[in-house]
């Protein structure tokens, strides 16, 4: 494979040239649907398309919230309850957007075999699901959608380390058991995903 041709192809299909940059939520949806799946942010060492790169070009994600690329954040959050794509931390437990046409193929590769009420118990018994992840999942099964602060409290993980709770959320997302469905104005930052 000619590496220069490969790089040119990537730049074009990842929408990196300035004239191909995405400028609207509808163009973002089209981008995801054409690619099948994209990362939300660029992932170091992984040459796959990302929404950020398709909007802002091939430069690092800016820390400043006024960077033009951060418009992707609003597009993603605004679409969580619209069911226009499947968004969760899936590939490498990183934020991934999957076309609804392709999502069933990803799900088929997961370790879900039948019933959402039973699969997690099998995973727990086999040691593939932590106690914390089990508590989070059971809380959502019993309580329905909750923002992360209320979910943490209801799952009796208020005293758990942040990393333990966040890992539980990531594991459940990566296995297609939960996904964010909205954003609540909760917590110190007035920003909390609803699962």
How does the language model describe each region?
Residues 1-195:
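Long, low-complexity intrinsically disordered regions
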């Amino acid at each position: 494979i000619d590496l220069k041709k490969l790089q040119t192809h990537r730049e074009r299909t990842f929408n990196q040239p300035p004239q191909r940059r995405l400028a609207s939520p509808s163009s973002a949806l089209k981008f995801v649907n054409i690619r099948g799946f994209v990362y939300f942010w660029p992932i170091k060492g992984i040459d796959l398309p990302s929404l950020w790169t398709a909007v802002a070009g091939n430069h690092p994600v800016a820390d400043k919230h006024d960077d033009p690329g951060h418009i992707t954040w609003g597009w993603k959050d605004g679409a969580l309850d619209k069911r226009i794509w499947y968004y969760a931390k899936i590939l490498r437990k990183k934020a991934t957007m999957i076309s609804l046409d392709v999502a069933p193929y990803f799900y088929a590769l997961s370790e879900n075999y039948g019933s959402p009420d039973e699969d997690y118990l099998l995973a727990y018994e086999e040691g593939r699901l932590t106690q914390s992840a089990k508590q989070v999942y059971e809380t959502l099964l019993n309580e329905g959608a909750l923002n992360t602060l209320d979910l943490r409290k209801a799952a009796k993980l208020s005293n758990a380390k942040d990393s333990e709770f966040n890992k539980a959320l990531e594991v459940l997302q990566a296995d297609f058991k939960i996904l964010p469905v909205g954003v609540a104005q909760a917590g110190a930052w007035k920003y909390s995903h609803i699962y």
